[in-house]
């Protein structure tokens, strides 16, 4: 069996996770002169805001309830770039805007289709992560002085041995208004963003065999 090709890389800053947080962190790091790597396990940037999920950025405007407000900083730059070339709000074009923003930074190395699966620590600090890049079939050993976990799931922290918790904390711990009275193991499920078009007439639909059928009572 032929083994994977192996490549060792060295950076000042290594950011794992190419969603909006990771992308903005990588751009900021590169602009400050640090040799930066952005490790993203998908073929596109943006995370939930990419064409793969299509959750548009609406934090500052509260989903357009406050249209006079706007995102700031690098996110604002990206949204202005998108407005300039993407009047149709096509999410595939938005993907290209984010990709170009990363490629514009000479200090930033973009590693797409690259999945981290191990981390090495020394004296309580991460020194190296091990990744597999699907598109090149390479095993990458990425060394860095600073690592940032922008995975959205704390994956880097987990591989580094950091303490973690899952589920919902009780209301008494942090006094969050919607927290349950007792702690539980419930977590957010899969996020499905549907897109519907009014065809103007009934359209037949046959649900697949694996679909779960919900009653009106369950939906109430």
Question: Which residues make up each language-model segment?
Answer:
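Rossmann-like dinucleotide-binding core of oxidoreductases
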Residues: 158-220
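Glycine-rich, N-terminal phosphate-binding loop of Rossmann-like dinucleotide-binding domains
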Residues: 18, 133, 151, 160
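Beta1/beta-strand and adjacent pyrophosphate-binding region of the FAD-binding site
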Residues: 7-19
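Short hydrophobic core segments
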Residues: 16, 142-152
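Conserved N-terminal/central alpha/beta ligand/cofactor-binding core
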Residues: 2, 28, 34-35, 40-125, ...
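N-terminal Rossmann-fold NAD(P) dinucleotide-binding loop
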Residues: 22
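Conserved beta-strand-loop-beta-strand element in the redox core of flavoprotein oxidoreductases
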Residues: 120-141
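Core beta-strand elements of the Rossmann-like FAD/NAD(P) dinucleotide-binding domain
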Residues: 9-11, 136-146
